[in-house]
Amino acid sequence: MGGGGTLVDGFRRLFHRRTASGSNQSSNAGEEAASSDLEVADDPDLVALRSIRIRVPKRKMPLPVESHKKNTVEMEFFTEYGEASQYQIQEVIGKGSYGVVAAAVDTRTGERVAIKKINDVFEHVSDATRILREIKLLRLLRHPDIVEIKHIMLPPSRREFQDIYVVFELMESDLHQVIRANDDLTPEHYQFFLYQLLRALKYIHAANVFHRDLKPKNILANSDCKLKICDFGLARASFNDAPSAIFWTDYVATRWYRAPELCGSFFSKYTPAIDIWSIGCIFAELLTGRPLFPGKNVVHQLDIITDLLGTPSSETLSRIRNEKARRYLSTMRKKHAVPFSQKFRNTDPLALRLLERLLAFDPKDRSSAEEALADPYFASLANVEREPSRHPISKLEFEFERRKLTKDDVRELIYREILEYHPQMLQEYMKGGEQISFLYPSGVDRFKRQFAHLEENYSKGERGSPLQRKHASLPRERVGVSKDGYNQQNTNDQERSADSVARTTVSPPMSQDAQQHGSAGQNGVTSTDLSSRSYLKSASISASKCVAVKDNKEPEDDYISEEMEGSVDGLSEQVSRMHS
């Protein structure tokens, strides 16, 4: 298909037939571009593609609120003055050990948003530092394909506040759920999804930032095919003088999407290629509907990677700095690479050629995001004007990473970040004002009471039963999946075309397991495991785990304790012990 160029023309014609909706989308996109640091106009090709709908699991609407309760439940969520009156709360959409998330409407723009209350931010300095890092990165990385912080509520006290209220744009679902709910995604979907991810990654890497945890659950999605990368809780800004060991000691990796060099500390300096590998794994999962490398442990992960790619060349082995990892791979039985055309049958050859470049075992052989965007696979989409870059982030922004922080240090740094969303107060702060928080009315006190009321009703089910979601990362809405995590519905053999894509707005029938799971939830029976381990999987503000996650027999996450390992070299020790 040459990258789907002919169907793009068809999408464009479809777009012109929908001039009314298209103009609305264009105007909304223009407002977005005006409010960000980027001047990225929506190209007609992209707008046309986004008019082709995909299935996203839908949330039930909350039960109607009785008129005499409306004031206490919704209208008085914020104070009657200042910033708080800007948002009208609708319902709680997630709750966990970190806090609670509510869906709301911005009364000035009509936009739906997610307001996330993070409880006791400073209870653990490490988690508070991660929140600081993510708030800062999401402020600095403003891009159409990266989730955006709309606002952060000003706390009532500069030196004593404990909770944070962050306002995000509200997305419908995530890519993990989209893959499971759609068994008829087309090559045009695959192409457009990958294009957006690489466009975001080009911008992130130009800033010298590594995301380090790219996976389908950390990519938000809407039914118009729009994707946004979220969860920068593990991201790092890379500077040339930063020691590699320090840079990676707190790395909590998602094994299934982890680059091979991270499975054993293979190379002396890590590069943006670690994110490129993750994108390759995600692209392969889009093509097949299943994870490409579902390793059960580090050794198994390396085994299944080499089963597909073959054993590394002698040149690659010679560059591996870790002796144990080098010896393990050297003694591995010789494997020949499996042709991608055999692994991914009936797939566009251009897509497979690009996938091979994304999944090269040696990081130096992987394409950069910019190089991948120039690949012939994107001939019908590529446009440098809508693929912005940026200057590297200043090292001064992350000077706090170089010193040991106290709770008060982190509180002051987070307060400074919050003021970025309050320009008048920021000016006072820069002048050295000590009482600035009392010059500007804060709605947080009333906000706390309203959240407490909503949480109580949420637990009692008075505003509608919360939807089941196995992996809940907010501000994403919660959706249901089958027990085994995969869509069991048999695919139809019908021809997939632009017209069929346009009709994919209704979720497919659930599998038998999913139906049983759903009926159990309706009867008030739940099987969630309320473990702190599930809650603490992520301290991210844009994608924290908010409900319990049932233990998986083959977990995709490895938890690497800084105290236990000291450095990422400990992974090689694990490889050696498990192999012996």
Swiss-Prot record:
Ranges spanned by the short sequence motif TXY, renumbered to the chain: 249-251
Disulfide bridge partners, by residue number: none
Gene3D superfamilies, per database record: Phosphorylase Kinase, domain 1, Transferase(Phosphotransferase) domain 1
One Gene Ontology term from the biological process aspect of the record: intracellular signal transduction
EC number: 2.7.11.24
Acidic residues: compositionally biased ranges: 554-566
A GO molecular-function annotation: protein serine kinase activity
Ranges where the record places region Disordered: 18-38, 458-580
Protein name: Mitogen-activated protein kinase 12
Organism: Oryza sativa subsp. japonica
Lineage of origin: Eukaryota, Viridiplantae, Streptophyta, Embryophyta, Tracheophyta
Gene: MPK12
